[in-house]
């Protein structure tokens, strides 16, 4: 394939998957944005399907998972409503303090519906990881 495609200088087609850092990807932790954010599949949804069912939301809330060490250094307690920002957006989400996440990383379930006033502050109240 790499012999038949017209590639720009420096472009490569690899025979197996190779990690490529995104423009806000791995290695972009800064003083302003000191934590990595990863998405994971939520137990009450299939991607965004079933994300609108109140009974499922009641038993499996949309929560940001954070390591106890990171939570303590930021005065975050389990159940707190917190603001999370990135260079491209902001969400508000409930915190779940758990040792199941490594320090320096937060985890947000994928599939939450975007709930923001796009004519106002544009802050997503639904905890949609794609906002970040």
Predicted segments, located by residue:
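Long, contiguous, secondary-structure-rich segments that constitute the structural scaffold
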Residues: 48-65, 69-132
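Long, low-complexity segments enriched in small/aliphatic residues
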Residues: 1-54
């Amino acid at each position: 394939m790499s012999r038949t495609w017209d590639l720009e200088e420096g472009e490569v087609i690899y025979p197996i998957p190779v990690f490529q850092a995104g423009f806000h990807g791995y290695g972009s932790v800064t003083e302003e944005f000191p934590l990595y954010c990863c998405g994971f599949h939520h137990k009450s949804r299939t991607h965004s399907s079933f994300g609108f069912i109140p009974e499922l939301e009641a038993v499996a809330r949309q929560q940001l998972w954070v390591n106890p060490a990171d939570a303590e250094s930021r005065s975050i307690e389990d159940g707190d409503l917190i603001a999370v920002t990135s260079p491209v957006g902001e969400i508000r989400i409930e915190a779940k303090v758990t040792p199941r996440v490594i320090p320096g990383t937060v985890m947000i379930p994928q599939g939450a519906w975007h709930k923001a006033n796009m004519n106002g502050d544009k802050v997503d109240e639904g905890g949609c990881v794609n906002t970040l």
